[in-house]
Amino acid sequence: MADEMDFYSSDYHNDDAFETPSKPPTSTSGRPKGSGAQGGGGMRFDTEEAREAALRKELEGVRKINEVIEGMIGTLERAKGNMGTVSQTVTNATTLLNTWTRMLSQTEHNQRLILNPEWKGATQDLLELEAEERRRQEEVERRAAEAERRREEARRKAEEEERRRAAAAAAAAAPAGRSVGRGTTRGRVRGSGLTRGASSSASGSETTRTTSGIARGGFGYTRGTARYRGAK
């Protein structure tokens, strides 16, 4: 009995499965309400994830580039240190080469001195050096004395020129003084001679001659004095 009931119930369910439903289904999918909003949020999450992944990838590329640049900088620093070492080595080699060149030059000089029959030793060399120094000092003193002599000669010429100018100026002023002195002296002597002649006319001719002689002598003396003053 129970088996029959199960059979009928199974047939009933099978018939319902092949029957056309009277109502359309309310939803074509089995998603609950609000599943669209959750889908939009998932898309945004996927976009942000992709953006972050791209940024992480770009950051990783930048880090690799920085590592490469740092490696290049380290290589350049090492190359710089190597170049400094090479430069120091070249400088040392140049110093050694210069020292060796000086040694060879000194050796050649010593050889020439030893083979020179006229070389009389280091003492003679010192004497020659001292003589050369004395000649140089004498030349300097001679030039200084020559310069002093030239300055003295120039000063003497300047003094002579100044004296000639003063003498020329005095000679130019002398003729005018002589003419004025002569006119004044002659007038004075002649007047005194006439006065003396008039006062002595009563005493006689001898007295008059004596007076005239005195007047002439006075005239001559005065003339000499006037010439002397004019010359001054």
Curated annotation (Swiss-Prot):
Transmembrane segments: none annotated. It comes from the Eukaryota. Residues 133-165 have a biased composition (Basic and acidic residues). Disulfide bonds: none annotated. Pfam families: DASH_Duo1. Residues 128-171 form a coiled coil. Keywords: Cell cycle, Cell division, Centromere, Chromosome, Chromosome partition, Coiled coil, Cytoplasm, Cytoskeleton, Kinetochore, Microtubule, Mitosis, Nucleus. Residues 1-44, 133-232 are annotated as: Disordered. It is found in: Nucleus; Cytoplasm, Cytoskeleton, Spindle pole; Chromosome, Centromere, Kinetochore. Residues 167-183, 191-213 have a biased composition (Low complexity). GO terms for cellular component: cytoplasm; DASH complex; kinetochore; microtubule; mitotic spindle; spindle pole. GO terms for biological process: attachment of mitotic spindle microtubules to kinetochore; attachment of spindle microtubules to kinetochore; cell division; mitotic sister chromatid biorientation; protein transport along microtubule to mitotic spindle pole body. InterPro entries: DASH_Duo1 (IPR013960). Component of the DASH complex that connects microtubules with kinetochores and couples microtubule depolymerisation to chromosome movement; it is involved in retrieving kinetochores to the spindle poles before their re-orientation on the spindle in early mitosis and allows microtubule depolymerization to pull chromosomes apart and resist detachment during anaphase. Component of the DASH complex consisting of ASK1, DAD1, DAD2, DAD3, DAD4, DAM1, DUO1, HSK3, SPC19 and SPC34, with a stoichiometry of one copy of each subunit per complex. Multiple DASH complexes oligomerize to form a ring that encircles spindle microtubules and organizes the rod-like NDC80 complexes of the outer kinetochore. DASH complex oligomerization strengthens microtubule attachments. On cytoplasmic microtubules, DASH complexes appear to form patches instead of rings. This is DASH complex subunit DUO1. It comes from Chaetomium thermophilum (strain DSM 1495 / CBS 144.50 / IMI 039719).
